[in-house]
Amino acid sequence: MTIAGRNKVVAFSIVLSALLCSISLLQAAFVLSGGSLPQLAVARVPPLLHTTGRAFMHVLTFLLPEAAARSLAAVSTAPSNSSTLVAILGTGLSAPLLLTYLLRRFEKTHAVEISYFSLFLCALNFEGVRLFLPILYTGTLTTYAGNVPMQIVMFFRSLALLALFASGIFAKKTLTRQEGAVVFVLCTVAFLISRYTTIHTIHAYRPSQSTQGAILLAQPISESGSIIDSTGEEKTLKVRSSAHRKTRILVTPQRNFTFYYGSHAWHRWFFWTTAVLSALSYGVLGHTLQISHYYIAAAALPFVIAGYRLLTHGLTWSACIVGLFLLNTASVFFIRSVHRVHIWQ
């Protein structure tokens, strides 16, 4: 791809990102005005958010008086669907801004890495598809209404992570300069991942626990991964626990767009495996070519993915704030370091 062709694609991505961001803002306004934002009934916060919340509280304690820091930390680390809404909108707003910065930096510079990184940034906008879930919810949530939007989201999440991984793998290979073919392969793999990832659209409650102890099933209920008949009434199903023992649990339809994920363990490992392999690929590039700026890019990529991971949860205000900070700051460092590589050459 030539510089002029790449610039046209990035410019189109900026326009598309701005359009998708505008649609997300309209969706958010519709959700808030119609009272469709669901109440969060789950207090089980993932380990990454626990760690982020504790770090955020230490920062607040250092900056503010102890009483004010504790009260603010209690609000910022409590699960909230409002923070999820802001995380979705913030992710969509970050994409066109970072793409504009990328285009200005590389307007006259050719870099294969940046072509794939722009694909990553463009894919971030499709987190806004999650806003269709509270809009589609009308008292009962069918399998189709819940699964289709989240399969779209999972496709673009997978494509974004694979694009980051490909940016380091294909940076210096002459044979893989056919970026269109590589992107097609990445889209195919991302589609297969999203198609066969189990999407859960229900809550599961153990009878001995209250609503505050709600958990998400890690095992599929059916072949499609969700309840076939969602009537709004509690149902009793039999599933296998981690110890391979059948356990009776109460199941209620899920209406919280925060938790429309696939299998959590797979989702988590996919993010962190991509982070490690992406950093390793740029580290190998830096060692092979003896260019120190590639080491900076390698160090920035795990923080980019960590910020993205926090924003996909967006479960607390601390996760939302830290995620936006990491995503934008690390992306700027990555773009600047790759730009210095090609200016130096």
UniProtKB/Swiss-Prot annotation:
GO cellular component: plasma membrane
Sorted UniProt keywords: Cell membrane, Membrane, Transmembrane, Transmembrane helix
This protein's record includes keyword Membrane: yes
Membrane topology: Multi-pass membrane protein
UniProt name for this protein: Uncharacterized protein TP_1003
Range of residues in the leader sequence: none
Membrane-spanning residues: 9-31, 84-103, 116-138, 148-170, 182-204, 269-286, 291-308, 313-335
Coarse class of the protein's main subcellular location: membrane
Subcellular location: Cell membrane
Keyword match Cell membrane: yes
Domain of life: Bacteria
